Amino acid sequence: MENTKRREFSHPYTPYPIQVDFMEALYDCIESYKVGIFESPTGTGKTLSLICGSMTWLRKNKAQLAVSTASADENEPAWVLEQTIQLAREEFSRNREMLQKRLDKMRRKNMRARISYEQGFKRAKKAPEPVDDSQFLPEDYSEVIKPEVQRLLSALAPPVENDFQEPVKIIFASRTHSQLSQFVGQMQHTTFPPSSDLQDLESTKLISLGSRKQLCINPRVSHMNSVQAMNDACRDLREGKKGGCKYYKNPHDALGKVDINTFRDTTLAEILDIEDLYKLGKHTSTCPYYASRASIPASEVITVPYQILLSRSARKAIDLPVKNSIVIIDEAHNLLDTITSLHTMSITKSQVSSASSGLQKYQHKFQNRLNSGNRVNLGYLVNMLQALEVFFEKAQKFHKKETAPGTPVTTSSLFDGSTADLINVNRLEKYIDESKIVFKIESYLEHVNGETQEKSHSSSLVLSSVMEFLRQVNNPDSEGVLCFDGPTKLKYQLLDPSEPFKDIVENARCVVLAGGTMEPTGDYLEYLLPYLSQDQIKLFSCGHVIPPQNLSVQVIPNGPNYSFNFTFDKRNDEKMILDVAITLLVYSKIIPEGMVVFFPSYKYLEQVVAVWKKAKKDGKNIYEILNDQKRIFVESQHDSVEKTLSEYAEEVPKGAILLSVVGGKMSEGINFSDGLARAVFMIGLPFPNLMSAEIIAKRKYIEQSVSEKMKAKGVSAKEALEASKGAARDFYMNICLRAVNQSVGRAIRHANDYACIFLLDGRFGKPEIQKKLSKWMREGIREGSFKEALGEVQQFFASHEKN
């Protein structure tokens, strides 16, 4: 292995020691084909460490690849090998030099005719057009395509040409497009040595990929409510008889290829984010959704949202080159939940009724104008929806226990007693895909509903939801379950997220899960990567960039008058709730600037505020008294988070308190640096609802799978039962502690920042709880009486006032 002391990572700034450790560990992880779980707290420069560590490996690997390919035949004489290697290096450099010159030329052209990013382009609204009923009709449908015709069509399709291909790529995925834009912004600050010493310069070639929702520039498609309808509308335009989509450039057409190549070179000449691509597409009248794919072969880095990377069908749709790539998943603390939610669907009785009604309206209007293929399949769809309506009507008459959340439902029972169970759902699914019927029906329903935003959304989007649910139920994952979520709601839930993720792990060279709060890591090993041995996984966790004296973590087991125990059966104690207010009031007098207080749920936050406003002292309630000390702002489930945060930030210099919710809008993606959070208070342990359908189904699955594994090892039934119950409890606790880590982790943003973290609940003193907290919190955690903690906090802020 290369001497790590000699590695130069081209970090744009002088890296902290923990950043160097991170980059070294990442380089080794990629080199050794491992799956890495990397934790680097918020504010430690995680993104730049990911970029510099992976790009350094990529550039060095490209140079080594050219030499190793040329020296494959070791039986040749030394002088022949040397000459072959030299020729390979020259060819390698020549190819990249040609690409670099082409991109430099495009970059100069862009500078002379710079797109006006500041002005931007407003997304066009749908222009009113004369309505012709025929636009709502599907093409005549037939399943039969003769084999000889299919072969002829395949032979006539020319191959897509790409003049250059990078052998290994970095695929960077994150949850939101704003997070991906931040990554692109960081990438713009970096430069890396060329992969060949015969080159003077090699710019980083990055392409940002997105869905039609982010990139479609045709208003006739982009205004559609559902993904299915957008996909169908796009295909309808491209394949239709009325001129097609004017933005789509056919890669098999000479003029189309020129436009695509120009778009490709423009995107690779400079590092652009998804908004830049959208504007570029508008400026050049070129569809960025399709044209951006031409940039994939020559790119070194590809950015994608979770929805594309984590969906097999989405990866296939854009030909995402996972094979042999370095896959980096940022903000991976929510990866298990994201994979589960992407493969989880639910429908309600009202949705089915609405979809059935809309479908029958369409059928009634166009029945006599449809060919037999459309007529028959539309009839099948109506039958299936009517059967589901009957199922829900029966379910409402069941005993409450039979429809309790998490109660399994067999697929056959959905259509029991109707002819719908005789329908070939696979053929029906094929019909939905090929006929674009969802788009046609949604378009018609929008028209008849007067095209108001609310009406079109409610009457048409539900059809897509029901169709997606039927697809999922028809093609269940091996570890999924169909269950009730009350008498009027059905849920199909993925129970084993390792199955859909396995395809990525097995094909990629290296997979890195990175986040600011990856603790506790046990769930990733048990439920995401159970098929990997310990030596195939690299765990990395670093401390914070701040010195120890800049952080104080206090377990507060009791207030001035009462113990803090926010368990389900005790959290409604009004005396304890009032003691929380008194605790905040006492600390607000010694903590400068802003205090952020996290509650387990919106419902509990509302309950606490109501209690505070009810209890009065000297004519004022405790809420008003606290508000006089520091102005209180309350996160709302419905109001704009930007407005609340802006008003809070404005008040912070004078002193302010922000009451927030774990898992709410303020707990992720918002950084409370410096005065925005000189203190973070965590009120209780935010366990999820134990009686929700998701938790019940997941708990049952864990208990069953662990029990079966234990019994297979020869363990007694009693021990297997204890182990299975323990595993389910541990999973439940991990969800809670991950949420705690994520919420409090937003307080420290840079090396000179400082803050106090208060954990208000006696249970935070338990070792089994503390071991699941982030490493940087565990190292400085203190527990004492209310008075002792108050004294330490006074000293903490007094020392920072002097500095």
Swiss-Prot record:
ATP binds at S40, P41, T42, G43, T44, G45, K46, T47. It is an enzyme of class 5 (isomerase). Its main location: nucleus. Keywords: ATP-binding, Cell cycle, DNA-binding, Helicase, Hydrolase, Iron, Iron-sulfur, Isomerase, Metal-binding, Nucleotide-binding, Nucleus. Its cofactor is [4Fe-4S] cluster. Binds 1 [4Fe-4S] cluster. One of its GO terms (biological process) is interstrand cross-link repair. [4Fe-4S] cluster binds at C216, C234, C245, C287. This is ATP-dependent DNA helicase CHL1. The lineage of its organism: Eukaryota, Fungi, Dikarya, Ascomycota, Saccharomycotina. The gene is CHL1.
